[in-house]
Structures are given as C-alpha cells and as structure tokens.
Curated annotation (Swiss-Prot):
It comes from Streptococcus pyogenes serotype M5 (strain Manfredo). Its EC number is 5.3.1.6. One of its GO terms (molecular function) is ribose-5-phosphate isomerase activity. GO terms for biological process: pentose-phosphate shunt, non-oxidative branch. Keywords: Isomerase. It is an enzyme of class 5 (isomerase). Substrate binds at residues 26-29, 82-85, 95-98, 122. The active site is at residue 104. Pathway: Carbohydrate degradation; pentose phosphate pathway; D-ribose 5-phosphate from D-ribulose 5-phosphate (non-oxidative stage): step 1/1. Pfam families: Rib_5-P_isom_A. Disulfide bonds: none annotated. This is Ribose-5-phosphate isomerase A.
C-alpha cells in the first residue's frame, strides 16, 4: 500500500514546473508528493513556492528546503496536490482523515488545477464508508454533537489520546458514521447551513484530476468540466 501511495505522489510531482506556486497537501499520500518536490528542489534546482495545508506539512516542507508563503500573501495557486479518503464516480470526495480539512479547502479554493493522489482502494461507488469529518467550534460542540446524534448520524469526537483532538485552527472534529451518503452535494449544503459547523470533509465538484495507483499501474482520471 505504501508503495502505491509513493507512486501516486511522485507521478503528481511531474505536473509541477518552474515558477509555480503550489499547494502542498496533508496526509500519507500527499507526503510523498511533498518529498518528491523537495528532492527536485535540491537536486534539479526546481523553483517553486509552496502553500501548506497544515502545520505537519509546513514542518515537512521546511525540512526539505521548499520555500513557503502564507495563503494570505498569494492571490492564486497554480496547482495543489492532496490526498483523499474516498472518491466516488462523480469526482466528489471525503477528506479530513488527517484533521486538516479546513486549511485544505481554503488552499484548494484559489487553485487553478486541483489534483488528488490516491491508491485504488479509495475509489468507491458511494461516499460514506469512511467517516465524514465535520470541523466545529469548541463553543456549543456538545450541543451540536447531540443534534447530530438525534439525526442518526452516529457522531464521535475525534480524539488524541484521552483528550479531544484540537485542529490547527483550534476547533474540534466530529466524525459522522453515515455508511452511505446518497447525495453528497445536498448533504454538504445541509452542513454548510448548520450553525457551529466551520467546515466539513465533503469536497464536491472541486477536483480536476485524480491520480490512482494500483498494482496494475497508474491511471489519471479527468473530472468533467463544469458546464
């Protein structure tokens, strides 16, 4: 599995060229993309500027000598590469297994080309087998948990040891065990309108390419263009 993740990450790095501003994703597959960019910076003199999606990725990129800028200092990003926890046939996805969904979505929004790197196990018919992360403010989080519980969403707080995990943005994550999300777009809108929800892990209609690594090789899937 790790070998497939590395293949996907290294393949995505081939889309990066000199002068680009690139979004650096978070997670076990995006890790290999960042590593390959670091190698190219060091060995090939690749000239890029990175925008990171988590403190973990910032630390990795700094260690590799990749120049970084804050999202607040750029207007657009040429290319962002990130992982995904599930991708359906309509190119909707669940992200946030690494608890970085808010920053990942913020970086994805001004991106001209958005690529996900996954192994074949992440491609699914319907989203929802992977728990859907919902980032919530700490104030009122227990009340919101009960709302989700009453709705039948089977919520659980993301934990770190014996305490609730706190994201880079100082929020909590409530994971929803939905089993199957029949209409990701509608459910995303529902969560968007829920007071106390900062962001959710449904990335609907955002990705341009999905690089899928399997035992048979690498496949690049192109999402249909809007309109």
């Amino acid at each position: 599995m790790e070998a497939l993740k590395k293949i996907a990450g290294v393949t995505a790095a081939q889309y990066v060229t000199d002068g680009m501003t690139i979004g650096l994703g978070t997670g076990s597959t995006a890790y290999y993309f960042v590593e390959e960019i670091g190698r190219r910076v060091k060995q090939e003199g690749l000239q890029v500027v990175g925008v990171t999606t988590s403190s973990v990725t910032s630390k990795q990129a700094e260690g590799l000598g990749i120049p970084l800028k804050s999202i607040d200092d750029i207007d657009s990003i040429d290319l962002t590469v990130d992982g995904a926890d599930e991708v359906d046939k309509d190119f909707n996805g669940i992200k946030g297994g690494g608890a970085a969904l808010l920053m990942e979505k913020i970086v994805a929004t001004p991106t001209k080309e958005y690529i996900w790197v996954v192994d074949a196990s992440k491609m699914v018919e319907h989203l929802g087998a992977f728990k859907l992360p919902v980032e919530v403010v700490q104030y009122g989080a227990d009340r919101l948990f009960r709302v989700f519980e009453k709705a039948g969403y089977k919520p659980s707080f993301r934990m770190k040891g014996d305490s609730r995990l706190v994201t880079d943005m100082q929020n909590y994550i409530i994971d929803l065990d939905l089993g199957c999300i029949k209409d990701p777009v509608a459910f995303g809108h529902l969560l968007d309108g829920t007071v106390g929800v900062v962001e959710h892990g449904l990335f609907n209609g955002m990705v341009d390419k999905v690089i899928v690594a399997s035992k048979d090789g690498v496949t690049v899937l192109e999402a249909p263009k809007a309109g």
